[in-house]
Amino acid sequence: IYSGEIMYIQDEVAAQNLPFSLEYVIPEEGTNVWLDSWVVPKNAKNKENAEKWINFLCRPDVAVKNFEYITYATPNKAAKEMLDEEIQNNKAVFPDAKQLKNCEVYRYLGDEADELYNSLWKEVKSD
């Protein structure tokens, strides 16, 4: 499952009264930090409306509704405070600083590194 789907899976299992035997783990060595972003291209024809859309999504009441719909963590602190305490403390949804200490945002390192990565990944996946 993907990181943001853990909450959805937990809810489905609980609704069906099934035993839950999955644990969400971030390796101690770290991993990539997951994020989705809204951006406005510099040559956008309707920059003002795009900014209004982003501002709308950043409203705490809207961010909570978005969280409830997609069950992916919200970075909006005011929205997070509006969630049930059990959800706020769910480390699978909102990892703490200790869990994120060794995590990083992946960045493109150029064609040579990309080719090496893909080659190594194919080797790992091979029989």
Predicted regions and their residues:
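Ligand-binding pocket segment of bilobal, Venus flytrap-like solute-binding proteins
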Residues: 1-27
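A general structural signal for well-ordered alpha-helical packing
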Residues: 3-6, 37, 50
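Solvent-exposed loop/turn segments at secondary-structure junctions
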Residues: 3-7, 29-32, 44-45, 59-63
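Periplasmic-binding protein-like
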Residues: 18-42, 88
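Mature extracytoplasmic/periplasmic domains
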Residues: 41-101
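Conserved C-terminal helix/tail region of periplasmic/extracytoplasmic solute-binding proteins
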Residues: 97-127
